[in-house]
């Protein structure tokens, strides 16, 4: 083991759903010069799936160690016989499940396996065995078929990492970002009809603070001392138009949160009318948007940065980033999937 290896952060890259493009994009990035220069890739998932995908795609595959072997290693070390990366064999399908497995067709079995690889990676991060988690795309319906109650990665991370209790207001927030635009969501995977009732000033203040702190750290890492420029979107058309198109959410919830956050020194615009918040002129003067619900932030982000955006969970005691796309079952194991979002997620994950 070299001194260079000792200083490389260990990145747990989870497979995602085995039937989707997750195995492919992990295999196509693990030995790239960019990834190798930034960290030590640990591919968390079923080794049999990785090897089968590598054979079909004609690409290289790292060596394999079991999860138990990895956890038995000293936390600061990496396998000396695998200096470029390794598969941590976990989240396994049974022999019978492997026999009936078909790329592009998810199942309860692939849902259970992807869930297990994520929980193993979370536990490894919490215990200090890895420095960050980069998650591959899961199939939420497969999780549901497997009897898993969490609607997605973010809720699972919040619960398992000890940052929130299921059913209570979460301490974590979802941020989607690219070099073009960054959005933090106040609410995540809930029906649109429930959004207004879930908004409250205290939670929104935390969201604004997390958004500002994230941009501030990233600016500092890039050698910039410029303060973050934050925009907070309104909930309603035209930000409520002084109550004409709203039930006073802007006046009673959003404005008080903005005023409270300004007391912490943040530079904030808002509440902005959502239909004009993302124009080119606005984006030039805004570093990060705080959005009230899922599609308010993700529609502009995916329209502008579909192939190279990254999902970052804010407020966790560990670092977690993710690709900002789904499993793309129609492209699975064909060598056609873009790796840009995975590369961006790895860049954001490096401490």
From Swiss-Prot:
Its EC number is 1.1.1.262. Its cofactor is a divalent metal cation. Substrate binds at residues 153-154, 302, 311, 320. Pathway: Cofactor biosynthesis; pyridoxine 5'-phosphate biosynthesis; pyridoxine 5'-phosphate from D-erythrose 4-phosphate: step 4/5. One of its GO terms (molecular function) is metal ion binding. Keywords: Cytoplasm, Metal-binding, NAD, NADP, Oxidoreductase, Pyridoxine biosynthesis. InterPro entries: PdxA_fam. It is found in: Cytoplasm. One of its GO terms (biological process) is pyridoxine biosynthetic process. It catalyses: 4-(phosphooxy)-L-threonine + NAD(+) = 3-amino-2-oxopropyl phosphate + CO2 + NADH. It comes from the Bacteria. Binds 1 divalent metal cation per subunit. One of its GO terms (cellular component) is cytoplasm. PANTHER family: 4-HYDROXYTHREONINE-4-PHOSPHATE DEHYDROGENASE (PTHR30004), D-THREONATE 4-PHOSPHATE DEHYDROGENASE (PTHR30004:SF6). The active site is located at the dimer interface. Belongs to the PdxA family. Homodimer. This is 4-hydroxythreonine-4-phosphate dehydrogenase. The gene is pdxA.
